[in-house]
Amino acid sequence: MDGRNRRKGLEWHFDLAMSMRGVGWNWQVKNIPQVTPKTKWQFVRTQLSKAFLFYFLFDFIWYNIQGSIYATPSPPPLLSDTVPRQILWTWIPGLESYYSFNMQFPLFSALMVGLGFYEPEDWPPIMGRLRDVDCVRDFWGKFWHQGLRKVCVPLLKLH
């Protein structure tokens, strides 16, 4: 095997090992959204804009959490607050995680496409639309695109 084929084989192996959703492979998970084709630099600009937006939203929520009474060493019980505030403070940590995760993916995808390692179509959105979610199954199948299934299921089958 010459050096070029060996390098191609290593690239192929790395791509396969890192693909949690199988994008572009014969085992791609269902419900990954189809995206309209973009040029390399349109994609990079769009992804960097998304990363900035999600960073701003993450930062906004993080500072609100840090300044809240619930970030103190002895926070009051959540049920002692009004119902609207209970709902708000139940959603805020989830939104913080959502924004944190969605800030990293577009940044990394812009870097990989910008450097020429991948094409824009190799990076469909990491999450779907929340309006497509009606139940827990839809959350994992349509919103999250079964992102952890291929990684976790083999571990669960260990005896």
For each feature predicted by the language model, list its residue ranges.
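Fungal eukaryote-biased detector of long internal structured cores
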Residues: 1-119
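Membrane-interfacial catalytic/cofactor-binding modules of polytopic membrane enzymes
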Residues: 101, 109, 113-159
